[in-house]
């Protein structure tokens, strides 16, 4: 799980890369769920929340850069 404090230290490019990784993981988890191979269904919710955290930090950085 990614913590917001850890994410704030990353650059915009790193955050976008992390978002893409989480989205790919979510896709794979949903595929596993559909095929009946997923054991830990709570992981889907965790990844969705991680994506939301990353997007929040990205937007905060964009707004901070716009105000400069």
From Swiss-Prot:
InterPro entries: Ribosomal_protein_uL29, Ribosomal_uL29, Ribosomal_uL29_CS, Ribosomal_uL29_sf
Claim: Calcium is one of the keywords in the record: no
One GO term of the biological process aspect: translation
Single Gene Ontology MF annotation: structural constituent of ribosome
Organism from which the protein derives: Leuconostoc citreum (strain KM20)
GO CC annotation, single: cytosolic large ribosomal subunit
Record-given protein name: Large ribosomal subunit protein uL29
Matching Pfam families: Ribosomal_L29
